[in-house]
């Protein structure tokens, strides 16, 4: 049987791959075998994507001096509600104050006691990661999909400990023919 006929016979076979459940940290480079349903929004709330000061965007341009009400560290709750002339110190990953929708990055501010002076800002860059930006509750991650670092990070934040992946195939290579030589052998000339 020639190579092309053999390949044709192989491809006629209905080869299916079974799946296995493995620890998330072992899944890099593997292929997801079942869809995953997302059980919560990621991020779970609006967060700052930069270190700076949370303000109301509508206040920018009208007001250049803002009173600092306090700060919200990453991982902490924020009960702050700001007025147009107020701000809250935020850090990357911090929860945004309930009615703030813009972060003036710290490089564009000057500290004056308990106030900041805004030196400039890019109105097209609010530096806010909105609730559900990465994943929305109820969303499905389809399969098959190659699991990379980004997906592992997201699944870890969603508390997935195990994932269902396609089992690694067992492959055998069976060389045949006189072109195969033992190590150290020399090919015969015709």
Regions found by a protein language model. Give the residues of each.
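Short, low-complexity N-terminal leaders and the immediately following helix N-cap/first helix
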Residues: 1-65, 130
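Short, glycine/charged-enriched hinge/interface segments at domain edges or termini
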Residues: 54-190
């Amino acid at each position: 049987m020639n190579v092309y006929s053999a390949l044709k016979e192989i491809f006629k076979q209905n080869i299916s791959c079974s799946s296995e459940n493995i620890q998330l940290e072992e899944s890099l480079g593997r292929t997801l075998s079942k869809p995953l349903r997302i059980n919560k929004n990621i991020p779970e709330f609006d967060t700052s994507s930069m270190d700076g000061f949370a303000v109301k965007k509508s206040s920018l341009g009208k007001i250049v001096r803002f009173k600092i009400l306090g700060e919200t560290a990453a991982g902490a709750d924020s009960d702050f509600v700001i007025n147009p002339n107020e701000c809250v110190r935020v850090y990357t990953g911090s929860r945004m104050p309930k009615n703030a929708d813009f972060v003036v990055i710290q490089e564009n501010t000057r500290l004056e006691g308990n106030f900041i002076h805004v030196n400039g800002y890019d109105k097209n860059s609010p530096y806010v990661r909105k609730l559900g930006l990465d994943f929305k509750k109820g969303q499905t991650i389809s399969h098959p999909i190659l699991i990379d670092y980004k997906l592992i990070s997201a699944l870890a934040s969603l508390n997935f400990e195990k994932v269902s992946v396609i089992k690694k195939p067992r492959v055998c290579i069976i060389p045949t023919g006189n072109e195969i030589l033992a190590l150290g052998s020399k090919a015969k000339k015709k």
